[in-house]
Amino acid sequence: MKRAYNFNAGPSALPTEVLEKAQSELLDFENTGMSVMELSHRSKEYENVHHTAAQLLRDLLNIPEDYDVLFLQGGASLQFAMIPLNFLDEGKVANYILTGSWSEKALKEAKFIGKTAIAGSTKESNYTFIPDISSLQYNEHDSYVHLTSNNTIFGTQWHTYPSVSHAPLIVDMSSDILSRPLPVKNFDLIYAGAQKNLGPSGVTVVIIRKELLKRNVDHVPTMLRYQTHAEKQSLYNTPPTFGIYMLKEVLQWLKNIGGTEQIAERNQTKANLIYGAIDESEQFYKGHATKESRSLMNVTFTLPTEELTQQFLSEAKEKGFVGLNGHRSVGGCRASIYNGVPVEACEALADFMHSFYQTHR
């Protein structure tokens, strides 16, 4: 069977090796006579999966001991509410840096909980770039500062993070976690939905500084407290066991190929192929993001006319490319090239883009 060239924005491509491993164990996991989906979450077999996944994440990101790793549910969207519920103090401000639709949604949820502010925004440009760090405006009353590390819809990404000392720095890394080495100690809370770089949908990874868990959250419902899940090692209630198993296998795959430094080189190679096709097209393809803010995960571009865009997408589909439609707020096309997308898929897409350009220039 020929695998599709999968450029979906999420859920997205998974490494073939991981899928094959899951397939081989689907009916009989480690001689239990059961699928991992059938195991009790209190069994020693599942607990080994659970704790191995957490340790692999620690190893790959060099997570310090004063951080907890949590496996939650509800996606990044639930984190948009959990964060202000747990950390937005009365009389203080939740300060958000707006770089796209997902940071807007995070801000919207915080407004239900308390006072908010905008430290910086590039909305006026339709989010074509990441704001200059020196332009960000903080407040002595900030309860925390929040940013989104990569913007899937607009194709922009932070390449240098702001340094924040007056308040906790919280970051949504749903679409670029583990795509490159990460200075975890620079952040107080990192969260990421799994369905782009970590595995299938259904698991949310949270990396949280233990100091934040000491806060009084008696006003927060039990399931929405980070303390609840940290105290029970993410086993307070039934976790998404199969999703965590798949997460473990993706993390093991990443470790086997050399970790974040190796995957960062691979991701740069993939991005260079597609951005190269854009830059060499004499403005036939136009990138949405400015060059200095370009994402290594989501490449966004437009063609001269809507008719050409639809023809491009139609021909691409015939050739086995999936998920290249751009988001309606940007239009055009988008190639999401997360960790699980092989270099060969990006080579094939770049070749197709060159060919289409030569035909229709």
UniProtKB/Swiss-Prot annotation:
N6-(pyridoxal phosphate)lysine, modified sites: 196
Domain of life according to the entry: Bacteria
Molecular function terms, GO-annotated: O-phospho-L-serine:2-oxoglutarate aminotransferase activity; pyridoxal phosphate binding
Keyword Amino-acid biosynthesis: yes
Class of the enzyme per the UniProt entry, highest EC level: transferase
Single GO biological process annotation from the record: L-serine biosynthetic process
Annotated cofactor note: Binds 1 pyridoxal phosphate per subunit.
Metabolic or biological pathway, per its Swiss-Prot or TrEMBL entry: Amino-acid biosynthesis; L-serine biosynthesis; L-serine from 3-phospho-D-glycerate: step 2/3
Family: Belongs to the class-V pyridoxal-phosphate-dependent aminotransferase family. SerC subfamily.
Subunit architecture: Homodimer.
Function: Catalyzes the reversible conversion of 3-phosphohydroxypyruvate to phosphoserine and of 3-hydroxy-2-oxo-4-phosphonooxybutanoate to phosphohydroxythreonine.
Official protein name in the record: Phosphoserine aminotransferase
Organism annotation: Halalkalibacterium halodurans (strain ATCC BAA-125 / DSM 18197 / FERM 7344 / JCM 9153 / C-125) (Bacillus halodurans)
